[in-house]
Regions:
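N-terminal binding-site loop/beta-alpha segment at the start of enzyme catalytic domains
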Residues: 1-72
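Structural motif corresponding to the early beta-alpha repeats
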Residues: 52-53, 67, 71-85, 109
Length: 270
């Protein structure tokens, strides 16, 4: 799989998200998550994104990566108000991951970001985290995010970007390209909606020449065809999905006419 730049890291174009999919505690479920992680290694996926707010997901990642931590870059998020509460939550993330170093620590949905940024900068200076990022679900947060980008206070942004949600194309993606800010894409499949909730079967015929076999691959390939995107992080609870998702990051870039087709076909069937 092609490696891309996410700040100072060389990451796989397709990563692994853990929202809901890794919020598990039962032994049988943890065994399945270990298989997912092992499949990631086979598929050359080297980046895992989690969050303190994802229930048991951080701890499940820590268990599933035991003994193979060096195969992955780990990212998580702080989501709470208050300096001391934030510090406690971050400390818990280190414990959940069972690690002394986190490659990327993000401020989840920009919650109390002005309070948490100095904490993350201190941790970065102490060598406990590698990079600082922010995430946001809504366009109203983009002006503040772009200010942080311009002032050099963050290394990465994580935003939704897919065939329907394209607001980032207007200003945020061009600025990220100009400044070299890493771009992580959440919700490339809109939590599976663009695959599971279509009114009919999309026509894959025009995409077969690229090697695309499923609509999920088409949607992921649509995202990573934008060279300003560093990585997209679909979540899954099914080990067999890893190879399917990873293929989208191993294909030749989708040409613009096929990107238009994927977008139009998705919108037609929603």
């Amino acid at each position: 799989m092609e490696k891309r730049e996410l700040g100072t890291l060389g990451v796989s174009g397709i990563g692994l998200g853990t929202l809901r999919a890794f919020d598990v505690t039962e032994e049988s479920d943890l065994v399945t998550r270990r298989q997912i992680i092992e499949n990631c290694i086979s598929a050359k996926i080297n980046f895992i994104d989690s969050a303190a707010a994802y229930g048991a997901a951080e701890k499940a990642v820590g268990i599933a990566t035991e003994g193979i931590r060096d195969k992955f870059y780990l990212a998580t998020k702080v989501r709470i108000e208050g300096k001391e509460a934030g510090e406690r939550q971050i400390l818990q993330s280190f414990e959940n991951f069972n690690t002394g170093y986190i490659d990327l620590l993000q401020i989840h949905n920009m919650i109390d970001y002005q309070t948490h940024l100095p904490t993350l900068e201190r941790l970065q200076d102490e060598g406990k985290i590698g990079m600082i990022g922010v995430t946001a679900m809504v366009v109203e947060a983009y002006p503040a995010i772009m200010d942080l980008m311009r002032f050099g206070r963050i290394d990465t942004v994580q935003i939704p970007y897919n065939v329907v949600q394209r607001e980032v194309e207007a200003e945020l993606l061009p600025l990220a390209e100009e400044l070299g800010t890493g771009v992580m894409v959440m919700e490339p499949l809109k939590k599976g909606r663009f695959v599971k909730e279509l009114k009919g079967e999309p026509d894959l015929t025009p995409l077969k020449e690229l090697g695309i076999q499923t609509w999920a691959q088409a949607l992921l390939a649509w995202v990573v065809a934008d060279s300003r995107v560093s990585i997209t992080i679909p979540a899954t609870s099914r080990p067999e999905r890893i190879a399917e998702n990873a293929l989208a990051g191993s294909l030749d870039p989708m040409p613009q006419e096929l990107r238009d087709y994927v977008r139009e076909e998705t919108v037609r069937l929603l």
